From Swiss-Prot:
Organism, as annotated: Latilactobacillus sakei subsp. sakei (strain 23K)
HAMAP family: NRAMP
MF annotations from Gene Ontology: cadmium ion transmembrane transporter activity; manganese ion transmembrane transporter activity; metal ion binding; symporter activity
Domain of life where this protein originates: Bacteria
Keyword terms of this UniProt record: Cell membrane, Ion transport, Membrane, Symport, Transmembrane, Transmembrane helix, Transport
Spans traversing the lipid bilayer: 38-58, 86-106, 119-139, 151-171, 180-200, 223-243, 275-295, 315-335, 370-390, 395-415, 436-456
Assigned protein family: Belongs to the NRAMP family.
Disulfide bonds: none
InterPro entries registered for this protein in UniProt: NRAMP_fam (IPR001046)
Descriptive protein name: Divalent metal cation transporter MntH
NCBIfam families given in the database record: nramp (TIGR01197), Nramp_1 (NF037982), PRK00701.1 (NF001923)
Gene Ontology biological process terms, A to Z: iron ion transmembrane transport
């Protein structure tokens, strides 16, 4: 046994060990890219990471906001979803470029530039954000299980704890298979809502006019608050760490500028395609809300309310059916399961990057899910399985996402605008100034949303 094999053997024997290598070593540089292939074949080889990133833009937390936006204000807020998606494309492209150019993910680069104490602080903040995301997915999955299989909410919450078994299976299949499974679940969500929107028969003229920003958005207080909710949820902090890492999964020459440029090109195309799908899903949700519920005065602030409304002919008319409700619940479950993968990978990335500590992925999942599931169980037991009260926890958990947002966006913009770090791949002036404008605006919006959530804003 040579020295490297002995080191690898000792590494696997330890439960916790020092992470001083490449980002997510399990998947880094593992996906082959065909040599001298054409555009489409090369693009297919790079497709995948974007799907994992897009999951964060169509999570259950966004569903309620989008459907409520349509139900209350018809198609007016489609323009807000469009602007939000363009912002997401910009920031995710920057995150991927940072990873490909430097060979470090955002957490590693932040730790390298700030030091150990700041690294620990940023790790704690980011872990809270990941837990907040996990809480939302636990609630979404548990409610979906209750709606589909009539499983009591508490049992549904406990069942979600065993998704670590799913993760173990997926990691054995390889990263390319994981990407394919996530993309399939995204497709399920897309086609469920596309089918339901086709049945709803929206006025396409009104839909198209919704892409043009309306002055009412700034003058109507309720509309403005919902618009802020849509924009404020645009960037999931952990997505920037995730993308800066998994963009390095492809095999390319790390020292060749032309190879890096090629990797950036195809990675950004993949990201933009998948984020466009997320944009379509969010538009479909808003259109569904407008076509089925606008003018009905229905309370659609909860998943259960939506589920019941889709089979109520007094609300949605003749197209109401249990099948519509079932498909909605299936899409909700698919969204929750996607987080099993992305949440765990993000958690591992920030742990390795900020505190340079590495544990097995299955253990990482058990710890994150264990900490996230406790408040959900407490809420569920205390409120006797009342879905409305449990969903309030989802709303409160989003505050942590808002707090963590500047922690990821500010370093990302700083690093990608630094020529010493990025070399010829540094942000162009228009990208730099746009990114800073977006960072400041989103940070202020999230502060306002936090104040609104806790009842302090006017």
């Amino acid at each position: 046994m040579d020295k490297k094999q002995r080191e690898d053997s000792q590494k696997h024997e330890k439960f916790i060990h020092y992470a001083d290598g490449s980002s997510l070593e399990e998947i880094n540089n593992t996906v082959a890219i065909p040599k001298n292939a054409g555009f489409w074949k090369t693009l297919m080889a790079f497709m995948g990471p974007g799907a994992l990133v897009a999951v964060g833009y169509m999570d259950p937390g966004n569903w309620i906001t989008s459907i409520a936006g349509g139900a209350q204000f018809a198609y007016t807020l489609i323009s807000v979803i469009l602007v939000s998606n363009l912002i997401a494309m910009l920031l995710q492209a920057m995150a991927a470029r940072l990873g490909i150019v430097t060979g470090m993910d955002l957490a590693q680069m932040t730790r390298a530039k700030t030091g150990k104490k700041m690294g620990i602080f940023l790790w704690i903040v980011t872990e809270l954000a990941i837990m907040a995301t996990d809480i939302a997915e636990i609630i979404g999955s548990a409610i979906a299980l209750e709606l589909i299989f009539n499983i009591p909410l508490l049992w549904g919450v406990l069942i979600t704890a065993f998704d670590v078994l799913l993760l173990l299976l997926l990691m054995k299949l390889g990263f390319r298979k994981i990407e394919a499974i996530v993309a399939t679940l995204v497709a399920v969500i897309l086609f469920v809502f596309l089918y339901e929107v086709i049945l709803a028969q929206p006025n396409m003229g009104d839909v198209v006019r919704g892409f043009v920003p309306s002055p009412r958005i700034m003058t109507d207080k309720k509309m403005l608050f919902l618009a802020l909710g849509i924009v404020g949820a645009t960037v999931m902090p952990h997505n920037l760490y995730l993308h800066s890492s998994i963009a390095q999964a492809r095999q390319y020459d790390r020292d060749d500028v032309a190879e890096k440029r090629k990797a950036i090109k195809f990675t950004v195309i993949d990201s933009n395609i998948q984020l466009t799908i997320a944009f379509v899903v969010n538009c479909l949700l808003l259109i569904l809300g407008a076509a089925m519920f606008y003018g009905t005065n229905s309370d659609l602030g909860r998943f259960v309310d939506l589920f019941n409304a889709l089979q109520n002919k007094e609300i949605v008319g003749s197209i109401a059916s249990p099948m519509l409700s079932l498909l909605f619940a299936v899409a909700l479950l698919a969204s929750g399961q996607n987080s099993t993968i992305t949440g765990t990978l993000s958690g591992q990335i920030v742990m390795e990057g900020f505190v340079r500590m590495k544990i097995p992925l299955w253990a990482r999942r058990v710890i994150t899910r264990g900490l996230s599931i406790l408040p959900v169980i407490i809420f569920t037991v205390y409120y006797h399985g009342n879905e409305a009260q449990v969903e309030n926890l989802l709303i409160y958990s989003q505050v942590f996402l808002s707090i963590a947002l500047p922690v990821s966006m500010i370093p990302l913009t700083l690093f990608t605008s630094d020529e010493k770090i990025m070399g010829p791949f540094v942000n162009r002036p228009w990208v730099k100034y746009t990114a800073w404008f977006v960072t400041i605006v989103l940070t202020l919006l999230n502060i306002y949303l936090i104040l609104q959530t806790v009842g302090l804003a006017a």
